[in-house]
Amino acid sequence: MTILPSPQQLRYLVALAETRHFGRAAQACTVTQSTLSAGLLALERQLDCHILDRGAGRHVVFTPLGLELVERARTALSTLEAVTEAAMAAREPMAGPLRLGVIPTIGPFLLPTLMPALREAFPRLRLYLREDTTANLVDRLTASRLDLLLLATPCDCGGADTVPVARDMFLIALPPSHRLVGEEQIPVSALATERLLLLEDGHCLRDQALAVCGLLAGDRGDQDGFAATSLHTLVQMVASGLGITLLPRLAVAAGITKGTGLVLRPLAGPGAWRTLGLAWRPNAPRSADYRALGTHLVDTCREALEL
């Protein structure tokens, strides 16, 4: 009878692949380094193959077969987790752990409203949060390292199922002495000669802002090397007279421009918004929970977007 690898051995394997360090992998699995090393050695003996290149010195190097086994281990662990999730969802909806990924242009502005609302509505739900860029979060969702994402679309969601929860309008942020301050609404055409300050590459808000302005990624932004890693930095750059920027209403409602003296104006014309929504893996066992959470988020987002 063939002896199958244990789930714990597969976790050791995946953890080592993700950290490329025995100590950090052991810490991630909450075991000692010797326990993890022994487990992986036993796995190699069971499978009668070399997973690691032992001739690489102190570096962790996987053999080609080892890399293939890592991907198969991820798939197997994801399937096992789905079995547990399906049973949990049937037994008690909206309970237990939920790994939520959120992008930096949403998290700081929505979570202060969202977290208390979720604790009150779903007291047995345990949220584990990770903030990162859209691409990194989608990769983690695909690899089953996250369960649910809170994103802004349009963006590449990697084929995930999605549900919209709110429309987040864009506002133009201007220094108080800017020539456009007197306008009630600002046409997109008026931005053609302006220095439009944007977040750096990797942030979906950058691409969304360019799309609203009808620009391509290579056309504008980062003039003279100016770029920001956060909306708070963008606000300070505009307040210093370096240019103008687009801010989502969610951030403005949370007070991001408070005390800066910046003037905010809506853009004229259609399409000047992003859509906030949830995303999860297709056929996820807890899909019904995620849709229910999306319905709950509609009211929460409406409250957070009030100016």
What is the meaning of each model-derived region?
Residues 110, 176, 242, 262-307:
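A late-sequence structural motif
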Residues 157-164, 168, 183, 190, ...:
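Beta-alpha-beta core module
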Residues 195-217, 286-296, 301-307:
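Secondary-structure junction motif
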Residues 44-64:
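A short LG(V/I)-centered, amphipathic sequence patch enriched
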Residues 133-146, 151-152, 202-263:
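Hydrophobic hinge/microswitch elements
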Residues 1-35, 39, 67-69, 80, ...:
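N-terminal short secondary-structure element
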Residues 95-158, 219, 228-231:
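Central regulatory/effector-binding core of bacterial HTH transcription factors
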Residues 46-47, 69-91, 297:
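Alpha-helical linker/hinge and terminal dimerization helices associated
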